[in-house]
Amino acid sequence: HQKAKQAIDNGYFKKGILPIEINETYINEKNKRANRTYTIDTDEGVRADTTIEALAKLKPAFAVKGSVTAGNSSQTSDGSSFVMVMSEKLMNSLGLKPIGRLVNCASAGVHPRIMGIGPIAAVPKVLKQAGMTQDQIDLFELNEAFASQSLAVIRTLNLDINKVNINGGAIALGH
């Protein structure tokens, strides 16, 4: 949440968010129908006021002595996104500027009982296919269904934490 809040405050997401105007009908405090209009232009799930102390007080979600809580799990979010993947030739013909480059891709499976650790198998595979090392990667965007799963990936792959989800991940921004 802290990384996502900082990214929002610094305007990092502004160019990537299309503001949506909402016209809402609701029942007000006088139990009467009312209307209001507002604009959504910022991710709503980020809890800027979350503290380590507050998170430590949350009860486990799945097992009595478990580590997964509502505070270290991603919320379900309402949003959408898209990306355009195209050849350099098409990009140039359309006069577009790239924001990234797809160097290679790979898929890898892990045992289904261990959810969320696919990158442990996929990252070394794709790096080998591309003839690259982790040091050549500037940023790792890992899904964060649960913090424990993300930490397992980061620790097993020995990733530089300063290169992982630098603007927040799914725990703050949504799954």
Predicted region positions:
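Short glycine/threonine-rich loop-to-helix capping motif typified by GTGT followed
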Residues: 31-32, 112-119, 144-162
